[in-house]
UniProtKB/Swiss-Prot annotation:
The lineage of its organism: Bacteria, Pseudomonadati, Pseudomonadota, Betaproteobacteria, Rhodocyclales. This is Phosphomethylpyrimidine synthase. InterPro entries: ThiC, ThiC-associated_dom, ThiC/Bza_core_dom, ThiC/BzaA/B. One of its GO terms (cellular component) is cytosol. GO terms for molecular function: 4 iron, 4 sulfur cluster binding; carbon-carbon lyase activity; zinc ion binding. Catalyzes the synthesis of the hydroxymethylpyrimidine phosphate (HMP-P) moiety of thiamine from aminoimidazole ribotide (AIR) in a radical S-adenosyl-L-methionine (SAM)-dependent reaction. Its EC number is 4.1.99.17. It catalyses: 5-amino-1-(5-phospho-beta-D-ribosyl)imidazole + S-adenosyl-L-methionine = 4-amino-2-methyl-5-(phosphooxymethyl)pyrimidine + CO + 5'-deoxyadenosine + formate + L-methionine + 3 H(+). Belongs to the ThiC family. Homodimer. Substrate binds at residues 243, 272, 301, 337, 357-359, 398-401, 437, 464. Binds 1 [4Fe-4S] cluster per subunit. The cluster is coordinated with 3 cysteines and an exchangeable S-adenosyl-L-methionine. Its cofactor is [4Fe-4S] cluster. [4Fe-4S] cluster binds at residues 585, 588, 593.
Amino acid sequence: MNATEQFLAANAHVDEAAVQPLPNSRKIYVEGSRPDIRVPMREVSQDDTPTAFGGEKNPPIYVYDCSGPYSDPAAKIDIRSGLPALRAQWIAERGDVEALADLSSEFGRQRAADPKLDELRFPGLHRKPLRAKAGQNVSQMHYARRGIITPEMEYVAIRENNNRRAYIESLKATGPMGNRMADILGRQHKGQDFGASIPEEITPEFVRSEIARGRAIIPNNINHPESEPMIIGRNFLVKINANIGNSALGSSIQEEVEKMTWSIRWGGDTVMDLSTGKNIHETREWIIRNSPVPIGTVPIYQALEKVNGKAEDLTWEIFRDTLIEQAEQGVDYFTIHAGVLLRYVPMTANRLTGIVSRGGSIMAKWCLAHHKESFLYTHFEEICEIMKAYDVAFSLGDGLRPGSIYDANDEAQLGELETLGELTKIAWKHDVQVIIEGPGHVPMHMIKENMDLQLKHCDEAPFYTLGPLTTDIAPGYDHITSGIGAAMIGWYGTAMLCYVTPKEHLGLPDKDDVKEGIITYKLAAHAADLAKGHPGAQIRDNALSKARFEFRWDDQFNLGLDPDKAREFHDETLPKESAKVAHFCSMCGPHFCSMKITQEVREFAAQQGLDEAAALEKGMEVKSVEFVKAGAEVYSKI
């Protein structure tokens, strides 16, 4: 499929499915210390508790929202114009950037001057690229280390708290039982955080201190002012990344923009554009201009295209030009496989699956062809100079990650991890933000060792892992094999999880696969937050459990990660609208619903003047008679 044939800029349009608010949800904005700090959240309204169960009010809950303006009915979305430059004023008022007269990248200038690309080109960008003034450093880490709390830091502090205080106050205001409701629905289990330092409330100062220490990053390139600030770090909510991108086999620019908007609708905190096909530069421009979340790339992929796929022909000059090209477009973080050293390559010879990272294999081939260390390693300090001029964060790539559980935690993988730790300290010397990429394929009992060694070697820089996949026997289900490992390593301290779709190892994911991967990983990340005891993490669980106990079916659907699928599954069995208010579910029917029985036992206890234990015994006698009369079947059709 040729992207030029499939896509014309004049015909570009937003995916209508991505701009509809989710059921019973509305976009709200929590204002910060200045009017232009407006932090988006999703408010999910709930029905009142039925009179039979007390008839109380259930105030709305607030959900972390990555969807940007797309789910705001008040926003006018035209992907040919791109999103508003939310951060432009914040960037300008710091006084440390300059607008360039032209693109600095030779390749970027070539693309801009090519009239054959006019019909493909994003038409809505009318500003010049920015770069730090001479001698300046514009990274969030640099500001943090100087004691400056930026608007971006305040923004993420508000975002991380999820309006929890307002929710608790709204519970207290529901009536005479309000304080008790606040106590019950705000309660959560004490977690096990494995040495993390998660405060009860996230403050802007805490955000600043974590970034200054290197334990967290805010990936916000100065040339991506459309992005809504978010934070990646062990002491914050676990984030997820979605991969998109075309290949030589297919996919158009329109399709990739739709994958991005679809990813963020369902909860993608960042998106990586891994395009390897035609028109990579133009595809990336469309994605960045329309993305409210950070965009990451693997620059070596595009550099390889520039030398017609011959790894040995790559040079530092080509790679450097690619970094600048992408930085001036607004890429927020680069995966750079600088830890693939010549001495590590022979260590992979006895592996079952060799080197499976594309970037890792490219650099291994270059090292062997030239018999010297890669230019990514030898020019690392020069790369740091580029990164801090645009505030691009490093995602130090694990080019030697294991591609099978057979190869997990071997000397090549762990040797590279030590080198990534050394490179982290060099980047930090330049006040450049860093996250560390991790595996891969690792059985469950070996996962914690990965986390412990990463914390040790990389001095608590945020860990970003692909899964890991915990078994290799389930092609078509690797979103599940990896979701297991993702939940575990997220609990142990990983800051961001890279999603895996059902198509992993099999083909390019479509929109349905993207959604399946996102939902699986949102679930894994949330399970990790619960296990760590992240303050407020259990609020949504408690609200949904209360709705389930009170048979508020619509609230159960709407409070879930995927309201559409929950409603679809329920309606397959009970399609009538009356079933949405039924006091039983589609599995056990009206006579044997455990929650209905519990409700009846409580009512019975009140009527008989018994405590619940005595009522339970007597009530079960009554239920046993009903069971026999109904035919003595464990499950019944309705």
